[in-house]
Every structure is written in C-alpha cells, then in structure tokens.
Amino acid sequence: MSAKTLYEKLVESHTIRELDNEGHVLLYIDRSILNEYTSPQAFSGLRERGRTVRHPDTFLLNIDHVNPTRSQRDDLMTDPGGQLQVDYFRENAADFGITLFDVLDPRQGIEHVVAHEQGLVMPGMVIAAGDSHTTTYGAFGALGFGIGTSEIEHLLATQTLVYRKLKTMRVSVQGELPFACSAKDIVLELLERIGADGATGYAIEFVGEAISALSVEGRMTLCNMAVEAGARGAIIAPDKKVFDYIYGKPQMPVGELWQQALLEWSQLSSDADAVFDKTVAINCHDLEPKVTWGISPDQTGSITGRVPFPEQETNPLKRLALEKALHYMGLTAGMLLKDIRISHAFIGSCTNGRIEDLRAVAKVLEGRKIASHVRGIIVPGSTMVRRQAEEEGLAKIFIAAGFEWRQSGCSMCLAMNEDVLSPGDRCASGTNRNFPGRQGAGARTHLMSPAMVAAAAVAGHLVDVRSLLQAGE
C-alpha cells in the first residue's frame, strides 16, 4: 500500500466511485452550511424538478451576508433585495425541513464561526458550502471547500458531488512566531511568496512547529485564507488542541462515542513517507507584522517596508498589475507603508472575528483612544462571541476607545449590506480580501491582523503594532 497524504485519505474515504481516469470521483459530503446569498437558485431548482432534500439534518441554513449589524439588533433589511433573499431563505427552511439560524436566533453568526461553535465540524469530515472560505474547516482536520449554486442543488438532492481530485502542497512553517505576529501574518507571508494563484489546483497541508504552536482559532485564520492563494482545500492534522476545543460542543458525540471518535480522529495524519506534489518552506524567525498595500491579498509587505516601485519589476504583466494597484489605491511608489493614513478600521469576518481576535484587539486598545478622524467598527463573528466578549469586559474597552460595537454578521467584509465604505475611504481591515470595491465602490482596503487594525485606528495611519505593545503581552 502506497503512502498517502491526509488529503488523499479524506477523499478516498468519501469516494463512492471513480468516474473517469482524469481524477473525477463521486464524493459523499458529510455536512453543508448554506447562506442566504448563494443558495436561493438551488432551492428554486429543486422545486422546478420536484425534488426533495435527501438528508435535511446534514444541512444548516444561516443568515449572515445581508443582515444588518446595527447595535440594536433587528431583522429588517434596508435593501429590498436583501429582504427578498432573507424572506425566501426562511421559506426554503420551512418547506424543506432544514434548521435555520435566523437573524434574531441566539446562535446566529457568520457561517464559518457558527459551524464550529455548534460542533458541526468534526475531524475527518468532508464539508462543502456555497462560500469559498469553507476551507476554514481544515483547522479541525476536515476537508472543506466552496461550491457553486448548481452544485448546491445537486448536493441538496443527492448528498454527493462530482469532484476532481487536487494536487497536494505541503507548507512547512518552522520556528517560533515572533512577538506581535499571528496566523494572519503567516498566511500573508505565504501569499506574498507564492502569489494569488500559487496554490490553484492544490490542497494545502500546513505542518511545522509554528503550526503546532498556533491555537485552533489561529489555525482557522490560516486555513480560511488559503483560498486566497487559489487552494481549494487546506488541512492541518488534528491534535489534542483540536480535541479539547471541540469537546462538549452541542453536536459532538458524548461518552463512549466520544472515546471511539477520539481513537479514529487521532489517526488522521499524512503518512511519514507520503509524497506531496509541491513543498513550500517558511521560517518564522524574520517574520514581521504584515499589511497589504495593493488590490490582491498577495500584494503585501512587512509594516517596516515600502510601497514597491513598478519599474523595478522585469515582468511586463506584473509591472502593469503593480501600476494598476498603485493607481487604484492612491499610493506613491517608495512611500513607507506606515505613512499610509486611514479613515476607517474594521475588525470582524470569518477570518478574524473570533474571541481570541477580540482579546488581541483589547490588549492594544485598553487605555487608548482611536484617532479623531477614524471611524472604527468591531463586528463579532457570532452572537455567542459577542456575549462572551461582553462577559469578559472586552466590549467596554472597545467602546471606551471609540469603536462601534456591533451585532454579528459579515458586515464590512463585503459590500452586500448597509456597512459599506464610500469612494476614497481607506480601511485598515481584519478581513480576507482587498479587491477593488470589496468594501464599497472606490473604497481602498488594507488587510492585516486584528491587533494591527487596532493599532492603526489609534495612530490614524498604518503602524507597527509592536510599538504599542510590550514584549511578552
């Protein structure tokens, strides 16, 4: 028997049958979480064809993309189109017998936060959902990937998908993570190195002492943003940290079933002599806090660096891309990244809206005020995260510093609700994408860790968070 990677083992264990000699298989899917934005046409297709949902109990419907995050929670959408999506979503849940986490549900939140809170993600699972950041679930030793609307319809009806097997990439991250650096900095470093298409056609497995040292929530950030390199899957072998994190969650097995599950989950790893199609090595020793300066997550650099000079790029297509990015972002080649002035600071999203992210933000903000010209918004990843942040006293720190403390939702990660930037606004953002218009038409986005966002809000411009913290914090 040949040695296998963890990715190959997960795909093999869920393969119903091989479909051809080109790597296509019929894949069984354990779980799916659907949102109000990408699923409506799929349910319409079921109705038109007179089909039912094969296993409603393996699905969760969750409202997160278009809902308001105003401090006083309500379920009225300001956009008529958004209201229509939500109303139809509720109808689909009722008609097809699928559990719905509605806007006012105490379990509501961003799908990739809610799923692990409710114990819906378990090691060894294969999970598909109508959102590209489903790769997040790799932090638990599961294979997660995003699918399109037609695939959602097929999944609802059959519990299966036609799936093309991916190549494998091993990303080894060694060394101790430096002071004030985080998982966000690791993944931005990876993106800078391999590019926005460097993992296209691959499933990534993250390994190494730096990965083992990360918390489970840090690993979620890492796997969440692997898709920004083109990866259609990102996995970290589960360990005791994962098992402790998921223990006692609502949908987790209990008693003897839990012990049996642990025995199985403990075997989930790549074979020692497994061969990967590609290997990337990162040493954390010289890693610094990272920020993006351009219009793609791979257009990034260390906060101590400068905006690049396009004329120094020998590849004409890459040079053109640099020029386009600088024009849209309104930046001058050679300027210090820490001199970039911001108008907004946003903390939240499925990348960095969890409780550990908010604790890191509170360390920076405690006893400080944000700059008078900056509007700061913090949106917890779920209603449960919001409650916990309030119980820990974090919310009081945010409010005292001048941040708006909101209800949960996708919010300003994407311009699909009422939290939208105006043309020319510049935002330090703890999200995952900085494409033109992502946070609003003509708006400019700089990605960074939540702590870096908090530091920028205080300074009024991009700044090295290390200057605001004491080593050891």
Curated annotation (Swiss-Prot):
Keywords: 4Fe-4S, Amino-acid biosynthesis, Branched-chain amino acid biosynthesis, Iron, Iron-sulfur, Leucine biosynthesis, Lyase, Metal-binding. [4Fe-4S] cluster binds at residues 350, 410, 413. GO terms for molecular function: 3-isopropylmalate dehydratase activity; 4 iron, 4 sulfur cluster binding; metal ion binding. CDD domains: IPMI. Pathway: Amino-acid biosynthesis; L-leucine biosynthesis; L-leucine from 3-methyl-2-oxobutanoate: step 2/4. One of its GO terms (biological process) is L-leucine biosynthetic process. This is 3-isopropylmalate dehydratase large subunit 2. It comes from Salmonella typhimurium (strain LT2 / SGSC1412 / ATCC 700720).
